[in-house]
Amino acid sequence: MARVKMITPEEADAQTRKVYQGVIEQWGRISNFSKVLAHQPAALEGWMLPNEMIRLANIKSDPDYVKIQQLVIIKTSALNQSAYCMSHNVPLGTKIGLTAEQVAAAQGDDYMSSPALDARQKAAVRWADAVTRMTAHDDDVAFAEMKKHFTEQQIVELTVFCGMWNYSNRLCEALHVDLEHPDKRIEFQSK
């Protein structure tokens, strides 16, 4: 059971209801994470902006890049053992085309030798591993691989997603955010 009350749409103030409308437009429903974060509507709104402007904006234009974003999110959440974030992001990843083998490789420690991941995916997962373990500062080899496969903008974006999910993983675990039933989880919405 969550350590703080989850704010339902019926209980929400006008500002939060407006933010919730944006959540529904992005994800089709209001997750328990959003209901907890709604105690601070500005934080929830701040969470939504990069999702909309970076993640969802690429769904149709660059689905392979969205798969890489999902691998970064899955690796980060696996390292942090966040059952909540994994319960949403593994299904999101498979719905956009990640294979079970790719998801398993990203979650494990031997991803660099996995035939399921291509060089670009391995570079991103390795970077997420380094950022999450706080070793990226000194990992010039991992950064060189990122530079080989991604623009500087994409490197920043993938690092932002890793940071965002380190934040959400910790928030969900610290506040015991309740898992939704599988048929109540978020889904990418078409733009």
For every predicted segment, state its role.
Residues 1-63, 189-191:
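Mobile cap/lid helix-loop segments that border enzyme active or cofactor-binding sites
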Residues 24-25, 46, 81-85, 123, ...:
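Short acidic alpha-helix initiation/capping motifs at coil-to-helix transition points
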Residues 32-39, 65-80, 156-159:
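Alpha-helical scaffold segments that form or flank carboxylate-/histidine-based iron centers
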Residues 44, 88-105:
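Iron-sulfur (Fe-S) cluster-binding segments and ferredoxin-like electron-carrier domains
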Residues 69-92, 165:
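Short, thiol/selenol-centered motifs that function as redox-active sites or metal-ligating centers
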Residues 106-119:
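Acidic/His metal-coordination segments adjacent to aromatic residues that form catalytic metal sites
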Residues 116-160:
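Acidic/histidine-rich alpha-helical segments that form the ligand environment
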Residues 152-189:
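Preference for long, well-ordered alpha-helical segments
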